[in-house]
Curated annotation (Swiss-Prot):
GO MF term set: double-stranded RNA binding; metal ion binding; ribonuclease III activity; rRNA binding
GO cellular component: cytoplasm
Keyword ATP-binding: no
Entry keywords, A to Z: Cytoplasm, Endonuclease, Hydrolase, Magnesium, Metal-binding, mRNA processing, Nuclease, RNA-binding, rRNA processing, rRNA-binding, tRNA processing
Region (Disordered): 229-266
Organism whose genome encodes this protein: Colwellia psychrerythraea (strain 34H / ATCC BAA-681)
Annotated protein name in UniProt: Ribonuclease 3
One of the GO BP terms on file: tRNA processing
Length: 266
């Protein structure tokens, strides 16, 4: 499979970087399922560079926050979901070079392939230029996300938030069990079952890795817990029948009583 030159030109413009060695970009876009030099080594390099650049940016932006907050914010910015979003901003999928199997199964849209390609492009830019140029490019890609990110509980992953919620109430931790694995080794899908005593339902979730499936399951449980808590609030707020009867505004007047009062006045 070859890249459409027009798509490649559009991608270069969106990336904001013109390669001195265009073949580096082609390699960064080549999945290992395709023939020829693929992007895994570039991905390894780009992953490390991205982590460093984002860590430094957060270190400078939040001078009073501790290592825990900085780590959670960095994880939020460099996680697969975020990188896949960046890739979609560039319409990266239309430029990926995939093998026949990946092409047929819709690899252009697969989150894991998109995130790997972004990291590979970062590695390619570094080799084609230098760390300062690479840093400036990464910061331009993540500018909006760096502006809005804040330290706090929202940066914790779903499994951590669920664990802290349960521990704070002395409830046993959930159990995660892989109940199915499908696909080839390079393109697997994991199905995880999660149970916790805090809800009656058994949650089933899927992901391209065991970790992602477990995180998705934890997120679903958190959503169910929040839903139950909202319903409990509604029940507490809604006035009962007895409360309405006790309220003078809802009490019917007694005609005979009114007559007695009238005659007394006379």
């Amino acid at each position: 499979m070859k890249i459409n030159p027009h798509n490649l030109a559009r991608l270069t413009k969106k990336l904001g970087y013109e390669f001195n060695e265009p073949l580096l970009l082609v390699q960064a876009l080549t999945h290992r399922s395709a023939k020829g030099a693929h992007n895994e080594r570039l991905e390894f390099l780009g992953d490390s560079i991205l982590g460093f650049v984002i860590a430094e940016a957060l270190y400078d932006k939040f001078p009073k926050h501790d290592e825990g907050d900085l780590t959670r914010m960095r994880s939020s910015l460099v996680k697969g979901v975020t990188l896949a979003e960046v890739a979609r901003d560039f319409n990266l999928g239309e430029c990926l070079i995939l093998g026949p199997g990946e092409l047929k199964s819709g690899g252009h849209h697969r989150e894991s392939i998109l995130e790997d390609a972004i990291e590979a492009i970062i590695g390619a830019v570094y080799l084609d230029s230098n760390i300062e140029c690479c840093k400036a490019l990464i910061l331009s890609w993540f500018e909006r996300r760096l502006m809005v990110i804040k330290p706090g509980n929202e940066q914790k992953d779903p499994k951590t938030r669920l664990q802290e919620f349960l521990q704070g109430r002395k409830i046993p931790l959930p159990t995660y069990e892989v109940i199915d694995t499908t696909g080839q080794s390079h393109n697997q899908e994991f199905t995880v079952r999660c149970q916790t005593s805090v809800i009656s339902e058994v949650v089933i979730a899927k992901g391209t890795s065991r970790r992602k499936a477990e995180q998705e399951a934890a997120q679903q449980i958190l959503a169910l817990i929040e839903k139950e808590r909202e319903q409990e609030k509604e029940v507490k707020i809604k006035p009962t029948k007895q409360a309405k009867l006790a309220n003078p505004r809802h009490t019917k007047s007694n005609p005979s009583s009114s007559s007695k009062k009238s005659s007394t006045r006379k």
